Amino acid sequence: MKELLRLKHCKHLLTTHVHSPWTPSLTLTPSLLTLDTLTHPRHRHSSPWTPHSAPWTPSLTLDTFTHPDTLTHPGHPHSPWIPSLLTLDTLTHPGYPHSSPWTLSLTLTPSILTLDSLTPHPGLPHSSPWTPSLLILDTLTQPGHPHSSP
């Protein structure tokens, strides 16, 4: 069961929680993500996140997530995430129309997300489906453009 999530705050990845499903109202500390409300995807009465100052709209759709260290392509056999784990507004799961799939072995490093703005790669100013005020991932690249870091 997919849940609609919206981030309230994003900070540093200073700790990891290996193979530990997220629980209601979980706060990852120190300084990873401070989130309003989260219930496990199998919970029947889970609530969507409530954005406050977040400048973007329906942000993340996750099925199950247990390992915040790495994020890999849903087809990758060694991914700790299951298929369809993540769908962004304009950066979505492969197979969805007008989507831009995640690359293999996307690593969430310090400064995981910058919510203020996103600039396309300088060499590809018109190829990115990302919009301003969405997010920046440190090691996210476009398929076919492995060196196009934000």
From Swiss-Prot:
It comes from the Eukaryota. Expressed in placental syncytiotrophoblast and choriocarcinoma cells. This is Placenta-specific protein 4.
